[in-house]
């Protein structure tokens, strides 16, 4: 039995309503898509204030009011037509579009799947005018200068599409994410958000650093690096999060091109590559970056959502972004946004409130109290906090009076910059005094070692105050950079072992050692089979000669077996070198004398990106004299 041939249907043009609904399938994917399109229109109209009202996650209602230029009365019906816009009028303007919107299909697409009412007023109008999309009726209305777009009952006429919507909270989350992107891109615009009649978010117009802290929270604000780079027509600015601010998800990655939020694989790869020396594994960097370039150098007419772009010279853009972020991470050594930062409030300030010195002190005490489980002082914790929160603030001082009697480095060592090489190591019972760095802090920014704490940390003094160094993490970074430099130059020095280290190996490990012998030679290893079940390590890189040879060999063979020789050297090189450096770095409880500690500090100063270990953790932190004064409540 054969299936009946369906009757041929004639070719005919589709009705405008159906065309708009088809287009809406791409433009209006969910309530968040409506929010995005309306926010872009408001910003293109010059709005500086945005009021957003949502109901039931935006499914029942989305109303956005702006104070932009408004729409003239005679243009209101045209605004609801498909492909009607004031933003472009020729192909030349399309190729150099500088506005967020330009297609002229958003309002028509939204009106085809929801009940839309548009109310607008220009500065020349005596009153506002309203148009109802479903009927086309135009009538006078109340309202100030600007525009209100009220969208209700999304997908009321396409129930099949409505079934694909998620829960109210999920849709609300997507709407808020779009609003957050807008808030980060335009800190000069005040934004308020209400959901189901209750206030949800409010951001006053502010500087970029304050807006970023308000939107992304104090955790990111305390670990961000502000920077700005320019090269020719390219300019990149914003905030790159320190590796310590990395996250398990890529939910704090915001990249803007000419003010437009984009998701571009080229840009994401450039930023990720810049972090590869300090962030391995499954962690994602956090950042808010803005790229500016001539509009004609980027094509934004790639996808209906306008979230994808193409660059005229993609290679140049990639290299510029990569080097700019990499330089920012290298340049801000030691600025790890540690927990003693007091310039970022834990909660947003009330509108119009001005912080006083006493407020700053109280905030700092509250932050410290939240981190301390107990206080090693006589009075009870509650009484102490009550006393401190009611106390006066310390007066700022760049150099307290009590430091006037501290001898300088020149006086302490009769003009010598450091202790002689043949000086006897300091005894634990009476440690030698460390040279004090001069105020310029140029020669030795990490200062000079004073003591070792618990066999883990090196305590040093510099012109700013006190430096704490994690000696294992710091040594790990030094070894990593030396290994990386040697591998790039194909000059890894090899240390033959007087007695080869043998160990039982699996058939896979033995096969890997035989297959990737050339790669092992390049890495500085001599690993070969001495029996069907035994491998021997006869040489290791000189930099790693103190490490466990068996553990090193197993790690290298595991990576080679998993990824192959060429991929290990191309894509997994940094991870492999980080593992090797970790094996050979100085371990905890290794006692160092002052000469060894100072040698570590000098190596750190000469090493690129020495402020972060290979896993993204800080290698040192700076506590200024002002920080120490606050800890001991001096000057209050």
From Swiss-Prot:
Residues 417-437 have a biased composition (Low complexity). This protein is involved in the repair of mismatches in DNA. It is required for dam-dependent methyl-directed DNA mismatch repair. May act as a 'molecular matchmaker', a protein that promotes the formation of a stable complex between two or more DNA-binding proteins in an ATP-dependent manner without itself being part of a final effector complex. This is DNA mismatch repair protein MutL. One of its GO terms (biological process) is mismatch repair. Keywords: DNA damage, DNA repair. Residues 332-360, 417-443 are annotated as: Disordered. SUPFAM superfamilies: ATPase domain of HSP90 chaperone/DNA topoisomerase II/histidine kinase, DNA mismatch repair protein MutL, Ribosomal protein S5 domain 2-like. It holds the Pfam family HATPase_c_3. The keyword Mitochondrion does not apply. It comes from Ralstonia nicotianae (strain ATCC BAA-1114 / GMI1000). One of its GO terms (molecular function) is ATP binding. Belongs to the DNA mismatch repair MutL/HexB family. GO terms for cellular component: mismatch repair complex.
């Amino acid at each position: 039995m054969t299936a009946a041939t369906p009757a041929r249907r004639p070719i005919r043009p589709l009705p405008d309503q159906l065309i708009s609904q088809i287009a809406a399938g791409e433009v209006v994917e969910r309530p968040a898509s409506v929010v995005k399109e309306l926010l872009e229109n408001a910003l293109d109209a010059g709005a500086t204030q945005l009021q957003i009202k949502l109901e039931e996650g935006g499914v029942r209602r989305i109303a956005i009011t702006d104070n932009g230029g408004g729409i003239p009365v005679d243009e209101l019906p045209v605004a609801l037509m498909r492909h009607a816009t004031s933003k472009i009028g020729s192909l030349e303007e399309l190729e150099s579009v500088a506005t967020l919107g330009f297609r002229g299909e958003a309002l028509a697409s939204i009106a085809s799947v929801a009940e839309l009412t548009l109310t607008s007023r220009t500065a020349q109008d005596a009153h506002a005018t309203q148009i109802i999309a479903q009927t086309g009726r135009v009538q006078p209305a109340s309202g100030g200068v600007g525009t209100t777009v009220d969208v209700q009952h999304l997908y009321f006429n396409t129930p099949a599409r409505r079934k694909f919507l998620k829960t109210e909270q999920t849709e609300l989350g997507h709407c808020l994410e779009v609003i957050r992107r807008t808030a980060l891109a335009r800190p000069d615009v005040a934004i308020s958000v209400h959901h189901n009649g209750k206030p949800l978010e409010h951001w006053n117009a502010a500087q970029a650093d304050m807006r970023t802290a308000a939107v992304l929270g104090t955790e990111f604000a305390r670990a961000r690096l502000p920077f700005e780079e320019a090269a020719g027509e390219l300019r990149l600015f914003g905030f790159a999060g320190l590796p310590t601010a990395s996250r398990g998800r890529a939910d704090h990655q915001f990249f803007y091109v000419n003010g437009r939020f984009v998701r571009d694989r080229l840009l994401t790869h450039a930023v990720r590559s810049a972090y590869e020396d300090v962030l391995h594994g499954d962690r994602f960097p956090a950042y808010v970056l803005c790229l500016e370039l001539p509009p004609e150098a980027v094509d934004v007419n790639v996808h209906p959502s306008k979230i994808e772009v193409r660059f005229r010279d993609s290679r140049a853009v990639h290299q510029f972004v990569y080097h700019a972020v990499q330089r920012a991470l290298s340049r801000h050594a030691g600025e790890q946004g540690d927990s003693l930062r007091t310039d970022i409030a834990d909660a947003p300030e009330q509108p119009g409130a001005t912080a006083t010195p006493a407020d700053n002190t109280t905030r700092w005490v509250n932050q410290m109290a939240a981190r301390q489980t107990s206080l090693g002082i006589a009075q009870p914790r509650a009484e102490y906090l009550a006393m401190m929160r009611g106390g006066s603030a310390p007066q700022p001082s760049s150099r307290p009076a009590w430091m006037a009697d501290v001898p300088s480095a020149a006086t302490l060592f009769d003009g010598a910059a450091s202790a002689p090489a043949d000086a006897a190591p300091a005894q634990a019972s009476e440690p030698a005094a460390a040279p004090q760095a001069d105020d310029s802090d140029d020669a030795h920014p990490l200062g000079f070692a004073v003591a070792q704490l618990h066999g883990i940390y090196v305590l040093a003094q510099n012109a700013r105050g006190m430096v704490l160094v994690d000696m294992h993490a710091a040594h790990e970074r030094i070894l990593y950079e030396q290994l990386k430099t040697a591998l790039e130059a194909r000059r890894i020095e090899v240390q033959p072992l007087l007695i080869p280290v043998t160990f039982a190996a699996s058939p896979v490990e033995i096969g890997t050692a035989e297959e990737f012998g050339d790669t092992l030679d390049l890495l500085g290893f001599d690993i070969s089979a001495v029996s069907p079940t035994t491998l021997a390590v006869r040489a290791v890189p000189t930099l790693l000669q103190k490490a466990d040879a068996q553990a090193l060999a197993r790690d290298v063979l595991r990576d080679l077996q998993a990824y192959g020789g060429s991929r290990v050297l191309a894509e997994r090189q940094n991870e492999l070198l980080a593992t090797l450096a970790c094996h050979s770095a100085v371990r905890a409880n290794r006692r160092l004398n002052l000469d060894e500690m100072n040698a570590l500090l000098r190596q750190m100063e000469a090493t690129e990106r020495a402020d972060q270990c290979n896993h993204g953790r800080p290698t040192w932190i700076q506590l200024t004299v002002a920080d120490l004064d606050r800890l001991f409540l001096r000057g209050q």
